[in-house]
Amino acid sequence: MKPIDQKIYLASKSPRRRELLRQVGVEFELLLLRENSARGPDVPELVQPGEAPLAYVERVTREKAETASATMLSRRLRVRPVLTADTTVTLDGRILGKPEGDAEALEMLRLLSGRTHQVLTSVALKHLDDFWQVTHTSDVTFATLTEETMRAYSALPEPYDKAGGYAIQGRAAQFIKHIAGSHSGIMGLPLYETTQLLQQAGIRTL
């Protein structure tokens, strides 16, 4: 059996996922959907009727992996394992996606203020017919925020490409009272689970 390539494709437009992979020394190349594009393969991130948060995040991640792998083959790129991930924030079973404007960002902060919510990040690795997937859930507790604080934060650019409308590695770090889980997972790539996944596939991380 031919040894697996130790360099992977990362099919994600998230700069945070790139930083996290570099942190643990994983060699990767970005897999872009189009030439000169910073976007990863497009997969509609629409919640299906009655779909639970866990089922949603795992389905979207799997579809991203399938799309990215097909892109690699159609473009006749060197065959390598493809890594994808998706993060979703949920409160009381409700999925909080990426806010589309000030009003939606403010409403999300009001929901999260003083409450504990869950951040689910699913990671998938696809190599031809082989497929591995893992999902990590973290509990995040927000402090009780003043209306002034929430309005000030929702007016910043920071919330608008983040699930749940906040960035734990940004100014929203000051809102976080307690975390039970993976800090890197909340950022978008749980490093322990990701490296375990890579090792299962035969990719060395040290």
Please describe what each predicted stretch is.
Residues 13, 33, 128:
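Cofactor-binding loop segments of dinucleotide-utilizing enzymes, especially the Rossmann-like FAD-
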Residues 2-6, 48-206:
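Anionic-ligand binding patches
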Residues 28-38:
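A short beta-strand-loop structural module common to alpha/beta enzyme folds
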Residues 38-46:
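Short, charged, surface-exposed secondary-structure boundary motifs
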Residues 17-18, 30, 183:
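Internal amphipathic alpha-helical segments of the cytochrome P450 catalytic fold
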Residues 16, 36-38, 131:
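Surface-exposed, flexible loop/turn segments at secondary-structure boundaries
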Residues 2-26:
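N-terminal beta1-alpha1 ligand-phosphate binding loop
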